[in-house]
Amino acid sequence: MSETGTATEKPLFGRPWIFIRGVPAMKFLPPEGPPEIAFAGRSNVGKSSLINALVGHKGLARTSNTPGRTQELNYFVPEGYSGEPGDLPPMALVDMPGYGYAQAPKDHVDAWTKLVFDYLRGRATLKRVYVLIDSRHGIKKNDEEVLSLLDKAAVSYQVVLTKTDKIKDVGVPRLIGETLEKIRKRPAAYPEVLATSSEKSFGLDDLRAEIVRTVLL
């Protein structure tokens, strides 16, 4: 277990975070600069809730019980930086539209999916993708497709199990083991699976510490 509030974590997670930009298409991406950490996952897997829990701000990333509510690449950074050269934030968190089911017209869903895939394939400052998997359902076919895309693009990713408070405690270690076995031969997968619960604040320190290590690499 990581130590909360270490010197390396303080600059990233010891201050308020703000929303800076929603990106509906690749041409609206900010200039490449600070390292980016992205969160991917099926619709309603809990991406926005996890980001809010990580930074300690419940209303930062917009959450909804309606799958497919996030429709853009949403950028969040620590507060206190002008964004001018020489005063850039140390990193950005990117909340991506969910893939899979969404209550929206098919052409909209197709556009979000293309945006996500184009971003994952072609962003030089993308340091790691955290692929969120609902612990109640495990890795599904559309998750496998995203993992394969990341493998082909040689983009480092790590699997994070969400909503572990919804399953029995004894089931978490088993699920971690099963998930590790599924990704064992994937070339771009980080060989450690994290288990989290935004509702119970479980596993958040471990995820924060992993993000810090990734950004500082």
Curated annotation (Swiss-Prot):
GO biological process: division septum assembly
InterPro entries attached to this UniProt entry: G_ENGB_dom, GTP-bd, GTP-bd_ribosome_bio_YsxC, P-loop_NTPase
Binding site for Mg(2+): S48, T70
Entry-linked PROSITE patterns: G_ENGB
CDD domains documented for this protein: YihA_EngB (cd01876)
HAMAP family in UniProt: GTPase_EngB
Protein family (similarity comment): Belongs to the TRAFAC class TrmE-Era-EngA-EngB-Septin-like GTPase superfamily. EngB GTPase family.
Cited function: Necessary for normal cell division and for the maintenance of normal septation.
Protein name (Swiss-Prot/TrEMBL): Probable GTP-binding protein EngB
UniProt lineage: Bacteria, Pseudomonadati, Pseudomonadota, Alphaproteobacteria, Hyphomicrobiales
Underlying gene: engB
